[in-house]
C-alpha cells in the first residue's frame, strides 16, 4: 500500500490519520533515520490545527519507544522546520500540517538532517518498514534506552534572525505599509515580528487561530479579504500565507493579486540584477505560463521545467545548479536561504525588489502579459487512470490540433482532478474547458 503522496502523508484526521496509523508511521520513519543517525534527535513542529496535538503525541510516543529523543517546538512554518532541523543538528525533522487543506485534514512531512524533503526512494524505504510487522514489533526499547521528549518554546528567535539575514542589509522597510494575512496558521507569530523589526508599518489579519479556522476563507487560497484590506489601508503591499507558510500570494498597492508566474519572472530578473543567481537557469513546473519562458529568454535566462511539487522544483534546481525556482501556486524557493518554499523569505525579497525599483508595486510586479490560462479543480469520487477513460485520447488530440496547451492530472493530496488549459484565444479556451468539465464529470463524479 502506498502511503506517501506528492507532499508527505496527508488525510483526514481520525480517518486515515488515526493515532495507530501515525504511531506505526512514526516507528517506521524513526527506524529508517536510525540507519544514519548522528545525534539521536528528531525535531517536531506543527501548524495550528486542533488535530495537531493528537498527531504530535502519537509521533512522540512512537519515536521515544524506539529510543529517539524528541524536540517539540510547537506551531512553526514548514520552512522553519527545514531550517531548524539542520541548525539544531537533528537526524530528521517532522512537520505536522496539511498545508492549504481544510482544518479537518492533517499531514506529516519529513525532512532529512540537511533540511531537505525526502526523495521518493527514501519514502519507499519507510513504506517497506511500515509493512514489516516483525521489524516493527522487535524494535521497542526498554528501561534507560527509551527516548525522552522536551518542549522548547524559544527557537522562534533563531528562525527570525535567519529570515532577517535574507533581507538586504542596506535596506529597511520603514517606507512601506504592509498587510499580512497569516491564514490563522503557522506564520501567525513569526510574520508580524519579522516585518515590524525591519521597520514596516504592519497590519495583520487572520492571526487568531482556534484550531478550526486555519485557511478558512483566508490566506493564500482566499486572498480577496487581503485585497480589500490593502485598498482600505492604502498599503504598498499585501502578503497572504497558507496554513504552513511555505506558500505566498502577493497583492499589489491597487489590490490586484499578482500572478505566480509574474512573481517568478520579476524575482528571477531581480536576482540576476544583483548577480545573485548561481546559473542562468530558473526552475518552474510544467504548469507555468508560456509567457514566463518567453520573458526570461528576453532577459537571457533559461527556464527549466520539472514535475509539480516543490520537492521536485528543489531537486531540479540542484541538478541544474540553480538557486532560484518555484511554482505558479506560490511555492518559491531561494535556496541560498531555504531548502524548501518559504513564504516569508519570498515576501522579504518581493519587498526589497519594490523598494529598489522605486516604483509602485502594481508597476514593479507586472513585467509582462500572460497568455490566457484556465485552471479548474474538479471534485472527483474516483481516480481511475485517465488513459482508461473512453474518449480521453481523442479529446487530447483535438486540443493539440487547436494548439491548446493542456495539463490534466489528479491531485496528489486531495480527491480532485486539476485541469489546466492555455491558449491565445480566450473564448476558445473557455469553450473547451466547459467540454472537458462535462466529460470528466460524466466519468469521475
Swiss-Prot record:
The active site is at residue 99. It is an enzyme of class 5 (isomerase). Transmembrane segments: none annotated. Its cofactor is Mg(2+). It comes from the Bacteria. Mg(2+) binds at residues 99, 242, 244, 246. Binds 1 Mg(2+) ion per subunit. InterPro entries: A-D-PHexomutase_a/b/a-I, A-D-PHexomutase_a/b/a-I/II/III, A-D-PHexomutase_a/b/a-II, A-D-PHexomutase_a/b/a-III, A-D-PHexomutase_C, A-D-PHexomutase_C_sf, A-D-PHexomutase_CS, Alpha-D-phosphohexomutase_SF. Pfam families: PGM_PMM_I, PGM_PMM_II, PGM_PMM_III, PGM_PMM_IV. One of its GO terms (molecular function) is phosphoglucosamine mutase activity. Its EC number is 5.4.2.10. GO terms for cellular component: cytosol. Belongs to the phosphohexose mutase family. This is Phosphoglucosamine mutase. It comes from Helicobacter pylori (strain G27). The gene is glmM.
